[in-house]
């Protein structure tokens, strides 16, 4: 089998690491059997040569192997709403707000997230600010999804093996393959996904990785203004996997009768500010926050196969917000998760 030194040499020569070799190297890293120096060198080398679809697929396969899984029996209309983060836009937690709206409209949502790394407020931070207990065991998350239609998986609880590479990632301080693996390794194995990415090149890459990993209906999105969400401020690049086929296209707010507006007003300094915007959107307060959540929830409902199109999803999302159902989902998740407080 390939040695870490051989793998490093290969990245230096800009040559690909093959599937079985990548599986082997990732297992060494996840088990803590590779020295921090070699692990740092290899993940940096991969970034410099640019990770291939095959390398990312193999790495995601191993991360899934090492994860603590959430077993959800019925996976119809089951969707993961996630962003790679790292888009540097510092907006409020649009994907977290999207989770509540999507669940209110009939999807089951497994949200996989963490505390803010590059953002001022990660999904875990804003959920805690809302009063949600994010520290659940896998079977409690499964119960949460079954009962409320929503489950939040706090990444450190589900990827314990990541602690072996965490110090290396922290010290390097640059983006590595691990930044794009998070969205590919949902511990509940949701077959459908709305995935936001921080770079246009990742749209085509991530949708093909999800195809290889056996996903059902995936929309990978990149807002041309740099957002890892469906954007109101620019066109959004979409890579869609459906029935095994991939199509790539662009969507615009105007396609759905929405106005193009800058995302500037969506910027927040911390989780408390993010909570305010999130609740304003769910309380049906007219404004950019409500519109961008509606647009993203419409897209998520389409990927969850609750809606027949994004336009149909937007209609359902508007209903879920206007009826007060989306706002009620926040209290429901708070109540359900608080019963597990130790």
UniProtKB/Swiss-Prot annotation:
Function description: Catalyzes the transfer of the phosphoribosyl group of 5-phosphorylribose-1-pyrophosphate (PRPP) to anthranilate to yield N-(5'-phosphoribosyl)-anthranilate (PRA).
Family: Belongs to the anthranilate phosphoribosyltransferase family.
GO molecular function, a single term: anthranilate phosphoribosyltransferase activity
GO cellular component term of the entry, any: cytosol
Superkingdom of the organism of origin: Bacteria
Residue sites binding anthranilate 2 per the record: 169
Complex formation: Homodimer.
Protein name from the UniProt record: Anthranilate phosphoribosyltransferase
One Pfam assignment: Glycos_trans_3N
Binding site residues for anthranilate 1: 83, 114
Organism expressing this protein natively: Paraburkholderia phymatum (strain DSM 17167 / CIP 108236 / LMG 21445 / STM815) (Burkholderia phymatum)
Pathway info: Amino-acid biosynthesis; L-tryptophan biosynthesis; L-tryptophan from chorismate: step 2/5
Gene that encodes it: trpD
């Amino acid at each position: 089998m390939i040695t870490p030194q051989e793998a490093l040499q290969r990245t230096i020569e800009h040559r690909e690491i093959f599937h079985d070799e990548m599986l082997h190297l990732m297992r060494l890293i996840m088990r803590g059997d590779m020295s921090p120096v070699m692990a740092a060198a290899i993940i940096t080398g991969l970034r410099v040569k640019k990770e291939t679809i095959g390398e990312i697929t193999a790495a995601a396969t191993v991360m899934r192997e090492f994860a603590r899984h959430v077993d959800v029996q019925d996976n119809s209309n089951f969707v993961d709403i996630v962003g790679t983060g790292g888009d540097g836009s510092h907006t409020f937690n649009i994907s977290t707000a999207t989770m509540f709206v999507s669940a209110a409209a009939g999807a089951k949502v497994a949200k996989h997230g963490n505390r803010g790394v590059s953002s001022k407020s990660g999904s875990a931070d804003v959920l805690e600010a809302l009063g949600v207990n994010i520290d659940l065991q896998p079977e409690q998350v499964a119960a949460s999804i079954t009962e409320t239609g929503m489950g939040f998986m706090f990444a450190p609880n589900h990827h314990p093996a990541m602690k072996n590479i965490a110090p290396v990632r922290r010290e390097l301080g640059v983006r590595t393959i691990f930044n794009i693996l998070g969205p590919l390794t949902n511990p509940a194995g949701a077959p459908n996904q709305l995935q936001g990415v921080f770079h246009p090149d990742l749209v085509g890459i991530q949708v093909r990785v999800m195809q290889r990993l056996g996903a059902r209906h995936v929309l990978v999105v990149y807002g041309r203004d740099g957002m890892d969400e469906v954007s109101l401020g620019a066109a959004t690049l979409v890579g869609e996997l459906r029935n095994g086929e991939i199509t790539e296209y662009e969507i615009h707010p105007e396609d759905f009768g929405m106005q193009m507006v800058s995302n500037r007003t969506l910027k927040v300094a911390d989780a408390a500010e993010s909570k305010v915007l999130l609740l304003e959107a769910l309380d049906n307060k007219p404004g950019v926050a409500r519109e961008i959540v509606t647009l993203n929830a419409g897209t998520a409902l389409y990927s969850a196969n609750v809606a027949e199109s994004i336009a149909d999803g937007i209609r359902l999302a508007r209903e879920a917000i206007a009826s007060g159902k989306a706002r009620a989902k926040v209290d429901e998740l708070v109540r359900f998760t608080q019963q597990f407080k130790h």
